[in-house]
């Protein structure tokens, strides 16, 4: 009579490790720190708790084990979302749409989800994080200088006036356009303008005017290329003014 003796094997699970036991390829249970004996048809896969968990089989099957489900942190990121992962207080990674799993207990994780399908950044994300190399690809920004005002258009529709400052929005398919205006005093010049006086004397006039934009909505929303329109209005006003005087009268005006 021949008796076949099946050998057993010993597996040690170290601190900050987790073992998953499979029997004939089917998940059985989770192991914590300690030493264990197994039959040859059983296998143990060891995982480092300080690293993300990549499920060897369908995750939903593993999560049916209450002990394993309790040991895992499952992060679900939807379409048009990103998740910022902070590890021990520092930004570690940014995740796009998908499902991610991490072990609890070994590392202090914090996740901040953001809906990047909208424009406004309403999530609790600091400016320094928005400028981080991992987050910057998802962000667009515009700077309005202290001497400027701007108007914000979203999908071609006027949204609001922007005062001086730096503005950040999520980068997506929504069209964002910012029109700026310099609010400092500016000078408009007309050189070599040929104008007839009241007595038909032909003059070549050089003139200048100073102006300042005070109503940005009127300048940009109600007028197309307001500066060109202002130039034309200045030309017409100058012609009308000069045409109201004879040549001699103009000389008297200019020499007063």
Model-derived features: where do they sit?
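N-terminal hydrophobic membrane-entry segments
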Residues: 1-256
């Amino acid at each position: 009579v021949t008796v076949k003796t099946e050998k057993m094997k010993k597996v040690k699970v170290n601190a900050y490790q987790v073992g998953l036991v499979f029997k004939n390829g089917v998940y059985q249970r989770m192991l914590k720190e300690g030493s264990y004996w197994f039959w040859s048809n059983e296998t143990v896969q060891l995982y480092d708790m300080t690293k993300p968990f990549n499920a060897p089989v369908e995750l939903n099957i593993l999560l049916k084990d209450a002990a394993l489900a309790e040991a895992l942190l499952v992060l679900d990121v939807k379409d048009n979302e990103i998740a910022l992962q902070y590890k021990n207080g520092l930004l570690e990674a940014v995740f796009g749409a998908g499902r991610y799993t991490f072990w609890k207990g070994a590392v202090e994780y914090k996740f901040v989800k953001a809906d990047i399908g909208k424009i406004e950044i309403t999530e609790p994300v600091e400016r320094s994080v928005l400028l981080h190399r991992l987050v910057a690809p998802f962000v667009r920004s515009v700077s309005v200088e202290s001497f400027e005002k701007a108007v914000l258009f979203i999908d071609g529709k006027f949204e609001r006036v922007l005062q001086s400052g730096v503005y950040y929005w999520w980068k997506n398919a929504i069209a964002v356009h910012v029109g700026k205006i310099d609010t400092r005093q500016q000078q408009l010049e007309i050189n070599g303008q040929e104008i007839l006086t009241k007595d038909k004397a032909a003059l070549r006039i050089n003139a200048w005017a100073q102006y300042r934009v005070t109503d940005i909505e009127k300048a940009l929303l109600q007028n197309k290329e307001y500066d060109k329109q202002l130039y034309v209005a200045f030309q017409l006003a100058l012609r009308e003014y000069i045409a109201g005087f004879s040549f001699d009268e103009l000389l008297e005006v200019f020499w007063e």
